[in-house]
Amino acid sequence: MRHLLVVAALLAGAAPAAAQLMPNDQSLVTFNRYIAVRERRVPGFDSPGIPLGSFTLQPTLDANVLYNDNVLATQDDRDGDVIARITPALTANSNWSDSLLSLSAIADIDRYGRLGTENTVNTNLSAYGWHDLSRATRFRSLVRFQSLRESRESQDVFVLTRRPIRFRTLELGVGARHRFANTQVSVDGGVVKSDFDDAVRRSDNILIDQDFRDSVLKRGRARVEFGQSPAVAYFVQGTYDRRTYRLRARDPLASARESEIVEALGGVRFELPILARGEVGVGYTRGSYRGVQFTPVSGLAIRTQVTFFPTQLTNVTVSAERRVSDTGVPSSGGFATLSGSIRVDHELLRQLVLGASAGFRRDSFNGADRDDERFELGASADYRLNRHLSARLNLSRLDLTSSGTGAFKSFVANRLLFGVGVRP
């Protein structure tokens, strides 16, 4: 069941160019010694789903009321509004012994009290599956379609448009893994096609062409794990990305922004009796671009997340990452991100989970004199009334500072959310 929950969470993710195309396959080190607070299945509060033949259906409905004091993420003339957000979702997981098929449909429907131009509907349709050819060999595949609106707070925003920019992505992925005694080899690859709609500038109704962002991303990844014990495994991992743009034949800028990004990592995955589990990966990354105006970006690569369990009711999760990504900003080929965060979750009286988080992120853009620094703070409370009904309260603050001659905007946004969740 825990494996299915992880798959569902990954399939629900939405991003223009996801950092991870395929969900991670099962590692040599499976996390089963400790149970994180938000993973715990509490008797009497866990929804069993609806049996339907060889599938189990998990319909959900989340209804939230959100207040954002800076909806447009502007530096001056901040405009706040109340948003009603409805999120219906349906997941169907097969009950087969040697295979899994997981189908998912999710929609996020936002309706604003005053700023009707911000009303959005985001959809996510996906199908993920795996089949065990033998105890040692597994094949996997993924198909996902998303219709999304770009966040006003995205690092790719370079102009204030009348409505959030709409785009669609189609993702196809395949993967395989094989185990040899205490060694596991896994490979996967995929294609992501992105298509952006044009938008109108908010200040003067001038059409802003977005066709230069239409692209195809091809990704390949290979990973080898060496198991020292059921609780410790060392790994090496390599990832290769190649992005091409639809207008490259007739648009010099689109051709110049075509990129190749490589990443090589080595590290360890563990779940130890010292009350800690996680994965630490360190290595090298390099992004290169066709245009001579965009110099290569290279340096340290980091992908690390470790959870500590000081008590059975408290988790502390620490994350750090450094990577190179492509961007939608026309004056830049891409950007290097350095980020870190800490989150504390505490379970109180079985039904109430309290959380607090803090994070920092720095984006340094290639080809443009621009550095963005984001500081985020958050606090949350999730209350389980029974197996069918839950309630949540979230508070968050984002403080973004953009510097350099190519800086776009600096802003602060505070958000308050109250919501309820319904399960069958």
Where are these regions (language model features)?
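Positively charged n-region of N-terminal signal peptides that target proteins for export
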Residues: 1-3
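Short, linear, compositionally biased motifs with a strong N-terminal bias
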Residues: 10-11
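Cleavable N-terminal signal peptides
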Residues: 6-7, 17
